[in-house]
């Protein structure tokens, strides 16, 4: 009996129903709730699992390199990046007929292949890889790192190598290690790779281990570094006629501030990128020496926080008590980490297209669309997770005595003001934005499109002008040709910036108008509503006027029985659950906007977006319907084409999405009755009744069914849009 699943909970292992299985899976990673868990074992388990996570990541990236080297066309792509389609891997499928074999044999391949829309070809090319042998070497190295990570994870579970709790809670040492050791040293190492391998590679010089020590990255070597003449490293940059990967038009500079884009590759100058990483390395190497550890110098974080008491008294006891609150709560730390990572991931989505760093990636439109959408969705899930763990912190780890009248306690004390302000902002944005859209729809429907309310985003245009965009005629700061900022910019810093901002061939500072104004506020509505639900969930997690003892019920509970009416759907988990729908909704609007705007930009008919994006029917007809036409014809009675797999995935995504509603709309009692009927039929059916079960079948709990519904809704939603995005973009641009 003791060996039944789950072994981490004897109470659950003895449950006679199928609840044992589902609750076991649901709580498998909730280490805090396991039998016999101690704080020390909790920290050690999480620490060891990090190495397993790293091993999986290294194995996965190794697989990418290996499959491209084995089945891809990297060497052919390198010869002509703009016209050869990069191959991710081969496809073998016994169901393929001759039309499918022909449709999927692309990129110069002999048989069916998948085209890579991940941008890895451009990345590998930019950082200096040129041959399949390079890819195999990288795959082997990452495989080696994966094995090392697994060994390290196993090692740190052995008694002799298990770190103590005090080691885990040594915040200063950890910060120093992460800032200097991880960010600082890795940025410096990456600068080294760019300067020694990637930049020579972009100039037609093949640097590998055999000649690494013989090839000077700069004609003057380390001389300028030691003599303080650092500006010599910026002299003689690549010319505007430079052909990437060759010596034609190349220079000798290694660290520059050119600004703008390489004219041929449409990506940032590699020498600018190296300079950026060197600066980052310097900042983090210094930052990693700020905190007091072994030598008695530097800051103590606890002292810093204890001293943060604003003299005006408006923030009470300021940051007193926060050090121990944060340092003793893994949920608080995870919440902070997820919030930071979520913001960074969204910034990555934004910057990968507006300031492309990889050679020729800006001209690979499908890859640009896929990467933007991918990173925005990931950012959404990570950010909602941050609030989820913030709420769990308030329920499990928050100590009111320890935080009396500090900034954290004061957040809880005036939560009504915070929540009601967010509610007011959401209502204002929602009614006004929808009102404008609907008004415009009515005007078009009644044949008077000239009566639409079209608002120019003059403040945003002014900001773009201040950064150098001249087309609006604002004549301010960098767009003012006789101003000091403009003149300094032409020589001292980023001379290429102004020409890049005013080029219409890139995505830097797109020209904006009334359609952008409206969708911007629609997105603002989504962001504020998502935030409202998440913030309310966290701030009400310990209790509310309706349910003051809420924290005693834990993070996820359906209701407090029939005796307390109105306690359903108010757990912190329910807030997270509702917020994910709004998050998906918001990112849908963000990606629709980005994609439609860019399709018209790439096709050279931006006026279609400008004219149709000011009313809802325009979005439905001229974006969704118009761009799904190729998808809907991916296969039909007359045959199929290379979009057929996306057409099928589009259909399948809708199916998964719709399945979600089955769990979201019908609740536990319906399923319980159905299960009991099915069990009755099973037990009375010959042959079938030879199969018995130990656990009595019961329906999922309300919370679990909601999770299953949410998972189907999310996965189906994203699958559907991914298929639409890739097919509609690749169908137009190849």
From Swiss-Prot:
EC number: 1.97.1.12
A GO term, aspect molecular function: chlorophyll binding
Keywords for the protein's UniProt record, in alphabetical order: 4Fe-4S, Chlorophyll, Chloroplast, Chromophore, Electron transport, Iron, Iron-sulfur, Magnesium, Membrane, Metal-binding, Oxidoreductase, Photosynthesis, Photosystem I, Plastid, Thylakoid, Transmembrane, Transmembrane helix, Transport
Residues where chlorophyll a B3 binds: 662, 670
Protein's membrane topology: Multi-pass membrane protein
PROSITE patterns: PHOTOSYSTEM_I_PSAAB
Regions that span the bilayer: 46-69, 135-158, 175-199, 273-291, 330-353, 369-395, 417-439, 517-535, 575-596, 643-665, 707-727
Gene3D superfamilies, per database record: Photosystem I PsaA/PsaB
Binding-site residues, phylloquinone: 671
Free-text cofactor note: P700 is a chlorophyll a/chlorophyll a' dimer, A0 is one or more chlorophyll a, A1 is one or both phylloquinones and FX is a shared 4Fe-4S iron-sulfur center.
Known role: PsaA and PsaB bind P700, the primary electron donor of photosystem I (PSI), as well as the electron acceptors A0, A1 and FX. PSI is a plastocyanin-ferredoxin oxidoreductase, converting photonic excitation into a charge separation, which transfers an electron from the donor P700 chlorophyll pair to the spectroscopically characterized acceptors A0, A1, FX, FA and FB in turn. Oxidized P700 is reduced on the lumenal side of the thylakoid membrane by plastocyanin.
Subunit composition and interactions: The PsaA/B heterodimer binds the P700 chlorophyll special pair and subsequent electron acceptors. PSI consists of a core antenna complex that captures photons, and an electron transfer chain that converts photonic excitation into a charge separation. The eukaryotic PSI reaction center is composed of at least 11 subunits.
NCBIfam families: psaB (TIGR01336)
Name this protein carries in UniProt: Photosystem I P700 chlorophyll a apoprotein A2
Organism: Citrus sinensis (Sweet orange)
């Amino acid at each position: 009996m003791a060996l039944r699943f789950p072994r981490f909970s004897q109470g659950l292992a003895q449950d006679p129903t199928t609840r044992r299985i589902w609750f076991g899976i649901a709580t498998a990673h909730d280490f805090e709730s396991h039998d016999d868990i101690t704080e020390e074992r909790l920290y050690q388990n999480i620490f060891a699992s990090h190495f397993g996570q790293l091993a999986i990541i290294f194995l996965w990236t190794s697989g990418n390199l290996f499959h491209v080297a084995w089945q891809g066309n990297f060497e052919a792509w390198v010869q002509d990046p703009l016209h050869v389609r990069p191959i991710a891997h081969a496809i073998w499928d016994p169901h393929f007929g001759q039309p499918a074999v022909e449709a999927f044999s692309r990129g110069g391949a002999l048989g069916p292949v998948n085209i890579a829309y991940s941008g890895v070809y451009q990345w590998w090319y930019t950082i200096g890889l040129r041959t399949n042998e390079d890819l195999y070497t990288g795959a082997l190295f990452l495989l080696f790192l994966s094995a090392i990570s697994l060994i390290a994870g196993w090692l740190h579970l052995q008694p002799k190598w298990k770190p103590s709790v005090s080691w885990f809670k040594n915040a200063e040492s950890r910060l120093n290690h992460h800032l200097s050791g991880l960010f600082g040293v890795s940025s410096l190492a990456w600068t080294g790779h760019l300067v020694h391998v990637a930049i020579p590679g972009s100039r037609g010089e093949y640097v590998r281990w055999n000649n690494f020590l013989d090839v000077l990255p700069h004609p003057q070597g380390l001389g300028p570094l030691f003599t303080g003449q650092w500006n010599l490293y910026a002299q003689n940059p690549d010319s505007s006629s430079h052909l990437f990967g060759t010596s034609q038009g190349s220079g000798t500079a290694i660290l520059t501030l050119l600004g703008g884009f390489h004219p041929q590759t449409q990506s940032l100058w590699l020498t600018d990128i190296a300079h950026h990483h060197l600066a980052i390395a310097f900042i983090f190497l210094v930052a990693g020496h700020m905190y007091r550890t072994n030598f008695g110098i530097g800051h103590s974080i606890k002292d810093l926080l204890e001293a943060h008491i604003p003299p005006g008294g408006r923030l009470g006891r300021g940051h007193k008590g926060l050090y121990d609150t944060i340092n003793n709560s893994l949920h608080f730390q995870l919440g902070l980490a997820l919030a930071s990572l979520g913001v960074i991931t969204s910034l990555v989505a934004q910057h990968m297209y507006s300031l492309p760093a990889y050679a020729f990636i800006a001209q690979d439109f499908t890859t640009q669309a896929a990467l933007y959408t991918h990173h925005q969705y990931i950012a959404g899930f990570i950010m909602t997770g941050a609030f989820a763990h913030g709420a769990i912190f308030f329920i499990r780890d928050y100590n009111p005595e320890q935080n009396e009248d500090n900034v954290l306690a004061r957040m809880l004390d005036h939560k009504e003001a915070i929540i009601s302000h967010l509610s007011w902002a959401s209502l204002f944005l929602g009614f006004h934005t929808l009102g404008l859209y609907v008004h415009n729809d009515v005007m078009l429907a009644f044949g008077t499109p000239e009566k639409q309310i079209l608002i120019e985003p003059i403040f945003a245009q002014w900001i773009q002008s201040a950064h150098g965009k001249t087309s609006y005629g604002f004549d301010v700061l960098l767009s003012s040709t006789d101003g000091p900022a403009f003149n300094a910019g032409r020589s001292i810093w980023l001379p290429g910036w102004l020409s890049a901002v005013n080029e219409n061939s890139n995505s830097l500072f797109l020209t904006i108008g009334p359609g952008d104004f409206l969708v911007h506020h629609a997105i603002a509505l989504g962001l504020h509503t998502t935030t409202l639900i998440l913030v309310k969930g966290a701030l009400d997690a310990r209790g509310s006027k309706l349910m003051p003892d809420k924290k005693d019920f834990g993070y996820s509970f359906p209701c407090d029985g029939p005796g307390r009416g109105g306690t359903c759907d108010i757990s912190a988990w329910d807030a997270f659950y509702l917020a994910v729908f709004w998050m998906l909704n918001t990112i849908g609007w963000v990606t629709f906007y980005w994609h439609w705007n860019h399709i018209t930009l790439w096709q050279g008919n931006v006026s279609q977006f400008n004219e149709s994006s000011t009313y809802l029917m325009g979005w439905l007809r001229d974006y969704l319907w118009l761009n799904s036409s190729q998808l809907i014809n991916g296969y039909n009675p007359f045959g199929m084409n290379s979009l057929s797999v996306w057409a099928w995935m589009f259909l399948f995504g809708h199916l998964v999405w719709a399945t979600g509603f089955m769990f979201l709309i019908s609740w536990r009692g319906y399923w319980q009755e159905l299960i009991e009927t099915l069990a009755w039929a099973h037990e009375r059916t010959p042959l079938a009744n030879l199969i018995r079960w130990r656990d009595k079948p019961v329906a999922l709990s309300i919370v679990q069914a909601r999770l299953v519904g949410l998972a189907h809704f999310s996965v189906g939603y994203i699958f559907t849009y991914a298929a639409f995005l890739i097919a509609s973009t690749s169908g137009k641009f190849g």
